[in-house]
Every structure is written in structure tokens, then in C-alpha cells.
Swiss-Prot record:
ANK repeat start-end pairs: 71-100, 104-133, 137-166, 170-199, 203-232
Keywords carried by this UniProt record: ANK repeat, Coiled coil, Repeat
SUPFAM superfamilies per record: Ankyrin repeat
Domain of life from the UniProt record: Eukaryota
Family matches, as InterPro entries: Ankyrin_repeat_domain, Ankyrin_rpt, Ankyrin_rpt-contain_sf, CC144C-like_CC_dom
Protein name (Swiss-Prot/TrEMBL): Ankyrin repeat domain-containing protein 62
Bias (Basic and acidic residues): 298-320, 330-342, 349-366
The species this protein was found in: Homo sapiens
Amino acid sequence: MEVRGSFLAACRRRMATWRKNRDKDGFSNPGYRVRQKDLGMIHKAAIAGDVNKVMESILLRLNDLNDRDKKNRTALLLACAHGRPGVVADLVARKCQLNLTDSENRTALIKAVQCQEEVCASILLEHGANPNVRDMYGNTALHYAIDNENISMARKLLAYGADIEARSQDGHTSLLLAVNRKKEQMVAFLLKKKPDLTAIDNFGRTALILAARNGSTSVVYQLLQHNIDVFCQDISGWTAEDYAVASKFQAIRGMISEYKANKRCKSLQNSNSEQDLEMTSEGEQERLEGCESSQPQVEEKMKKCRNKKMEVSRNVHADDSDNYNDDVDELIHKIKNRKPDNHQSPGKENGEFDRLARKTSNEKSKVKSQIYFTDDLNDISGSSEKTSEDDELPYSDDENFMLLIEQSGMECKDFVSLSKSKNATAACGRSIEDQKCYCERLKVKFQKMKNNISVLQKVLSETDKTKSQSEHQNLQGKKKLCNLRFILQQQEEERIKAEELYEKDIEELKIMEEQYRTQTEVKKQSKLTLKSLEVELKTVRSNSNQNFHTHERERDLWQENHLMRDEIARLRLEIDTIKHQNQETENKYFKDIEIIKENNEDLEKTLKRNEEALTKTITRYSKELNVLMDENTMLNSELQKEKQSMSRLETEMESYRCRLAAALCDHDQRQSSKRDLQLAFQSTVNEWCHLQEDTNSHIQILSQQLSKAESTSSGLETELHYEREALKEKTLHIEHMQGVLSRTQRRLEDIEHMYQNDQPILEKYVRKQQSVEDGLFQLQSQNLLYQQQCNDARKKADNQEKTIINIQVKCEDTVEKLQAECRKLEENNKGLMKECTLLKERQCQYEKEKEEREVVRRQLQREVDDALNKQLLLEAMLEISSERRINLEDEAQSLKKKLGQMRSQVCMKLSMSTVTL
């Protein structure tokens, strides 16, 4: 249990370190942490996706295109991270720098790929962004596309020149990263691009080793199909098969061992086919020569047969080959020792040959039974390699048998033995022909499967091309839509500006109307004054006949009349000038209104054209998209059917493969690996137990020492506490006695004062004074005793304090640590105080600004009052031109109606355009 607990603790430690270091590869936290205080105006607009504000900040020169915020980020980086393609297109069109990096050395393209903003990334790639820039972790944009398993993005990056062999700080290429992250679809896509399969990471691991270590069987299968090296080792000397065995991934181990066995069988097939051709040609020549062959030729043939039999039996079992070779050696030895003039009977020799023939037939049956037994173990019905071996075995045995017959035929001519041998040879020939036909059928099937695979690969490549073309067309359509939206925004801005100009013109017309009113009022007043003067003149003339004495008054009135006429003439001139100015301004405004109408008509026409073009493009692209979607569904269905046929064909191919050599090799490797693992496990367990015992004993000793030290310190602390309490009590008693002494001294002083005042009474108190002095003496003696006791207690306390100092020294370390933490807290408090002071300063500034605003407000109020006074004067003058105003009002109302109609039409068209979009 202790070993298990320590093992779990070690695992927890490793997990903790892994959690600390998991962010070191750069694939976590793709977005930015945004705070408003770190951003400028252009950065806020880029995050919000407001193209107009971005344009305003650039046109007003508040920010530059490539300005950075406080976190070293440009507007392009923030727009790509937050997925704002309109802002990205605008910034790219204004020719900002595309390859500027942030604090982690990441470009805008890397951020767009990392945040899976494909539209932004495609805009950057089309305008020449570099796809091979590496960040501080050594990752390129392709690495982040692989981590997100975004195949379309990876295809675009590779199309624009991304390096498929670029390495990160861990030494991972794109293929190694996809395998390590278990991205199966991405691995299949990258293998089509033919990457370097021999690439290794910083630990010397290939893609196959990483796949076997992670337990991804489909990735291992794909890599084995591309003929990856199975025997590569990492830094620790482990192969992919070793990792599969250690992690108990039996399926992966079986696939790798089968791949090795297939390689060995192919090499054996190639060597055996060459030897079969040589043997068949030599056998035909020997049969043509007949029974006239000599003794050395027989020896050579027997040696060849022995070599052939050794090769076949070595693949099946080693023991049978040794027995057979011994028998063949005995036969050769007997043939060599035989003389031409021996007198042995032919029957004995025939018996020996029959015995040897029986042995060969028995060995042949043994070999076949062993082959069938191994086939039953591996559940294989029949493969091409097995049939080739079956072809070789009977042929070699038949050749041995024919050699024996030819050797025996030189000395005996038994008809029965010859007929038996002919029947055996005919049966063997038939079996060989049947097996050859079976092999030819298998070859034809294999070629058909190869042709099907090539056709499927072509279809897959064509589908990939069509997909890439469709994606490219989609991107072009999106670009055009973005451009059209941008044009519409510009047109809307122009329309808004025209409306603003129109509103300004209306305001100016209102001002002119007010001026006309004032003028009309002035005219009315002047007319009234004229009428009153004329009435006065009439009255004066009527009275002139009656009163001669009023002649002087008439003269005065005549002068006044003359002056009034001059004023009236002057006022008429002013009215004429005002009318002339009003006519000129009216003409100007009419011209401006006509120009605005023409501009509105042009804008309406352009809007109609744009709407028509938009509707046409949208319908066209929708039709193309529907067609492409239909084609894509058809191709996907065909692909699924072809994949099913491929899987069926692959299963058939696997059923035709041989696993004989792999079974034997796997058995040996299993036994050796089991032994090694058991030994290593036992050694590690022993070492772990030994270390655990040492650590436990050391911990127990330390805990005992700690408990002792704690007990001693607690005892000393209690003693110190008691002594301090005793000291406090004694000091309190001394203070009380000192207070009593001070009181008695005060009483003595009072008594002396009374004695000086009242001498006769003094005699009465002499005796009392003596008694008091006696009491004082006693008190002083008690005080001395108490002081001695205090000194003794202090000495004891000093001795105890010396013992406590040692304990306090130990405690001071902890106190220092606490003080350090307190200092840190004080520093934090200082920082907070600084922030508070800054906030106070800002508050003061705000109050000052508030006061300044109040001053400005007062000034504006004064100006408003002056303007009101002026307005009153103008109103007085505008009353004169009221008749003109009525006509202008009618015209203005008609213009307003027309403008309202125009606005409603424009709004309807804009709503229609938005609906179509």
C-alpha cells in the first residue's frame, strides 16, 4: 500500500508540472485579453468592427494605420483576432504592414488562423502575407491550422507557399504535430502532400512512434500504407512496437508485426521464385538426358535438393530439417562408397531406395501438417504466399523421388516400380499445374484491385480539385460581397451628407424668412408714420386758413415733413437693397436646390443599378452554390461507396497474406520482451521500496525531534508566563506602597503647614508624628525587602530569558518571513496609495475642468442673450417682408413634400437592398 501511495503521489506531482507547462506550446488561449485602458481610438474601432470610426481616426490623424496599443498590438492584429473582415479589408486596402508581430511574435495571419477566422486569413494571404513566420514557440500558421484540424485553412496555406517541414520548438513538423495531437483527418490530408516520413522531433521520435505511443490505430495504419520505416528508434532506443507492447496496444502491435512479416515474406518470395526457375530448367535438362547420367551429377542434384529442403523447412520448423539432412547425407555417403563391381543383389538396393522414398514422403506430410496447423492458428484460409510454398514443396520432393528412380534404374528394371513412379509424377504434375492456375488467378485479382485503387485515387484527386475550386469561387464571391457592401456604405455616407446639406439650406431659408418678417414690420411702421404725418399736414393746412398766427408752426411742420420724406426715401432705398439681396440669395438657394435634386436623382439611379447588380450576383452565386452542393453530395456518396469497396478489397487482401514467419518471430519477441520487462519491473519495485523505507525512517526521526523541541518550548513558555505574572504582581504592590508613601508625605507637608499656622495645636500632634515616623520606618524596611525580592526575581527571569533567547532565535526566522510578507503588503499599500493620489489628482483636474466649463457656459449664455437681443431687432425688421414670406412658405412646403417623397423612396429602396442582401 505504501508503494502504491508513493506512486500516486509521484503521478500527482507530474500532473502538476504538466499543468504548469501545458501553456508552453502556445496552443492554449488563442484570443487576446482586452482592457479598454490599453486601447487607442483605432484599436477600439477595430475590435467593434466599425469601419467608419477607423476611417475617421485615420483621416483626422488621431492614429496611424500601424499604431500599437499598450500591449504592443496593432489594429490589424485585433481585427483578425476578433473576426472583423470589413476592418481587415479596409486596413489592407490602405496598405498597412501585414507582417507586424505582437509581444509573442505572432502576425495577423497567425492570429486569424489561431482564432479560426478563415475570411480574414484568406484576405491576408491574397494580399501577400508571409505564412512562414514563426512565433516565440516556433509555431507557424500551419501548425495552428493543424491544431484546430482546419483542413481548408491548411490547404490554403500550402497553396500560398507554407513550409510543410517547418519545425516548432519541440521539433514537430506539421505531420508530427498532427500525429501527436491525434488529428486523424489532418494526418490523411498531409500524407497526400507527401511530407518527409523520416522526420523526428527533439526526442528522436518518428510519426509512427508517436502514433503507437498515443494508441491511434487508424494513424498507424495510414503510415504503414505509406511504407514508413518500422525499425527506427528514439533517444531511449525504443521502437514503435516497443511502445505498443509497453502500453498494451495489441491492435497496433499486431499491425506492425504483420507489416514486418509481410516484408520478410516478400523478400523470401523473391528469392524462392528465382531458385524455382533455376531448378525447373535444370530438372527438364536432366530428364531429357535419361538414365545415362553419371554418379557426380547425382551428387550435385542431391546437394541442390538438400539446400532446397533446408530453405523450406527453416521457414516451418528447424528440427525436421536436421533429420532430413542426416538421411540425405547417409544416402550420398552410400552412393560414394558403392563400387561398380559389387556383387550385391538388386533387391537389397531397391529396398534401401524404397525406405528412403518412404522417409521423404513422410517428411512431406509432416511439413504439410505443420503448415496447416499454423494456418489454423492464424485463421487464414489461403494466401498467395502459402500457395507458392506448396508449389515448391511437392516439386522438390518429386524431384528427389525421380532422382532415386533414375539411380535405381541403372541397376534394376522393375516394371512395377516404374509404373508407380510414373503415377506419382503425374499426380504431382497435376497438383503443380492446379496451384499455378490458382496463383495466376490471384495475380489477376491483385492487378484488378490495383487498377481499382488507382481509379479511386484519381477520383479522389478530382474531387479534391473540385472542392478547392468551389472554395476559391466562394472566397471570390465573399470578396465581391464585401466590396459591394463597402460601396453601399460609401453611398449611404454620401446620401447622409446630402441630407445634412439640405437641412442646412432649410435653416438658412428660415433665417431669411425671419429677416423678411423684420423688413415687413419696418415697412409697416414707416407707412404708419407717413400716414400719421399726412394726417397732421392736412390738419395743419386746414387750420392755416383759420389761424394766421400758426404760420411759423407750419414752417416747422413743413421742415419736419421734408425730413420725414428724406427718411422715407432712405428707407425705401434700404428696402430695395434688401429686396435685391433677398432675390440674389433666393436665386442661389434655388440653384443649390436644383443641384441637390440632380445629385439625389443620380444617387437613386446608382442605387438602382447597384441593387440590380446585387440581385443578379446573388442569384448567380446562389445557383452556382446549389450546383456545387449537389455535385459535392454526389461526390461524397461516390466517395463513401468507393471507400466501402476499398475497405472490402483491403480486407480481402489482408485475408490473402501470410502470417507464418510473423507468428514465430512474435512469439520469440514476446518471450524476450516479457523477460526484460519483468526484470526491469522487479528492479524498479525493489529500488522504490528501498527508497520509500529510507524516507519513512528519516521522516519518523525528524518528527520525534520536532515533538521533543515543541514540548521543551511549551514548558519554557509556561514558566516564563508564570514568572511574568509574579513580576507584575510585585511591581503592582511596590507601586501601591509608593503611592502610600507619597500620600503620607503630602500629609506631613499639610501638617507642617498647619504647625506653622497653629503652633499651640502642634504640641498635640507631636506624638502622632512620632507614631507616623515609626510607621514610615516600617514601610521603608518593607520596601527594601520587596526590592530585594524583585532583584532576585529579575535574576531568575534573566536566566530564564537566556534559555528563551535560543527559542526566540528560531522564532525570529519565521518573524522575518512574516516581516518580508508585511513589507510586500506595505509595498502593495504604497502602490494603492499612489493610485489613490493619482485618482485624487484626476478628481482635482476634473473639478478644474468643471469650473472652466461653467465659465464657458456663462460666456455662452451672455452670447445667447446678445443673440436674442439681435434677434428681436431682426424680427422687427422682418415684419416688413411678410408678403414675400408667404410665397416662400408655399414654395418651401412644396419642396418639403417633394423631399419627403424622395426620402420615402430612398428608404424603401434601402430596405429592399438590405432584404436582398
